[in-house]
Regions:
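A short, structured surface patch at a secondary-structure boundary
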Residues: 28-90, 187-190
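His/Asp/Glu-enriched short active-site or ligand-binding loop at hydrolase and phosphoryl-transfer sites
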Residues: 52-53, 176-199, 218, 244-247
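Structured C-terminal subdomain patch of bacterial secreted/periplasmic proteins
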Residues: 27-28, 93, 113-129, 133-135, ...
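Hydrophobic secretory-pathway targeting helix
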Residues: 2-24
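Short, charged juxtamembrane terminal tails flanking transmembrane helices
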Residues: 306-312
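Short helices/loops that flank or line small-molecule/ion binding pockets
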Residues: 74-81, 101, 202-212
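Basic- and aromatic-lined ligand-binding clefts that recognize polyanionic substrates
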Residues: 25-43, 133-185
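Alpha-helical transmembrane segments
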Residues: 293-306
């Protein structure tokens, strides 16, 4: 056997060994959180995902197994042989089962503000070696947030965000992600001083009627009879009378991942604080174009006038 062939075979062996070791060390992630599943997919880490919760869109990555994150089947989870399991809400059963095992249970609760969103994106990126991708995403999110907040016109309108109605009225305060958005956008959230120990307090209908919100945002689905505008006792509320009821896109409103800044933009646009950031950019470019055209026209006219005077 020639020396060159021996070297080639040795290199092939080393490469194969490295590949197998890398495959063995690669995390096998089961994500029981829609938000974090979607973050990992946006980071380009689909090869690390063994399973995701069933609420993740099936339009992409159909080959990734879907599991129930509400009624967790622990036997099914264990059969997938994960190295890491991600949850967004406490699960004592999983904690007990994984205690002392080689499975890392990663608890990433609902973010209370955009800084926590950024931190969770960066935390997950380290797990799947996508730090640079995550850093770029976070920088873009921060830039877009700055553009939105700096475009907002000052206001102190009373606002109410409804999370649930049929089984009790639930809202949110400043200790939640959406609540932090309302604070930054300059709104007065009528629930901010109600049961501040919880981010998503249960409230009485009488409080909403008394506080008389000027804008109502709804982040859940209701039957026609339960819709805000069809509730008899709410007919004198300012937001109802003036048709200032906004139904947020449910998936966008209930997650706190990379799309969080899009939600902030959507709220700012739908409440009339600003135009869509992308539209504002286009409008600015149009105005810049018009100004350049006008200046160019004036310069051309002045030049022609000067030449006419020189020849006369």
């Amino acid at each position: 056997m020639s020396k060159r062939r021996k070297i080639f075979l040795l290199m092939a062996f080393v490469s194969a060994t490295f590949f197998l070791e890398n495959q063995e060390n690669k995390p096998r992630i089961v994500s029981l959180s829609t938000t974090h599943s979607e973050i990992l997919l946006e980071l380009g880490a689909h090869n690390y995902l063994t399973a995701v919760d069933k609420h993740v869109s099936k339009g992409r990555f159909k080959n990734i197994k879907r599991v129930d994150s509400y009624i967790v089947n622990t036997e099914e989870i264990l059969s997938l042989k994960p190295t890491h399991v991600i949850i967004a809400f406490k699960n004592e059963e999983l904690e007990q089962i994984f205690l002392g095992s080689d499975i890392d249970l990663i608890f990433l609760p609902p973010a209370k503000n955009l800084n926590e969103v950024y931190d969770q994106i960066l935390t997950l990126s380290k797990l799947v070696n996508k730090e640079r991708v995550a850093q770029n995403i976070v920088e873009k999110m921060k830039k877009k947030k700055f553009e939105i907040i700096s475009s907002v016109k000052p206001n102190r309108k009373r606002i109410y965000n409804e999370l649930g109605y049929s089984y009790g009225i639930y809202s949110l305060n400043k200790n939640s992600l959406l609540g932090s958005f309302y604070t930054e956008l300059g709104f007065v959230n009528i629930v901010d001083n109600v049961n501040t120990q919880e981010e998503y307090p249960k409230i009485e209908e009488s409080l909403i009627i008394e506080k008389n919100p000027e804008i109502i945002l709804v982040g859940h689905k209701e039957g026609v009879g339960s819709r805000v505008e069809n509730r008899p006792s709410w007919s004198n509320i300012s937001a109802v009378k003036n048709k200032k009821i906004i139904y947020l896109e449910e998936n966008l409103a209930n997650n706190w991942g990379i799309s969080s800044v899009d939600l902030l933009d959507d709220i700012a646009v739908q409440t009339g604080l600003i135009q869509n950031v992308e539209n504002e950019k286009r409008d600015s470019l149009h105005w810049l174009f018009y100004i350049v055209v006008i200046i160019s026209s004036v310069l051309i006219m002045n030049n022609r006038t000067r030449k006419i005077k020189e020849h006369s």
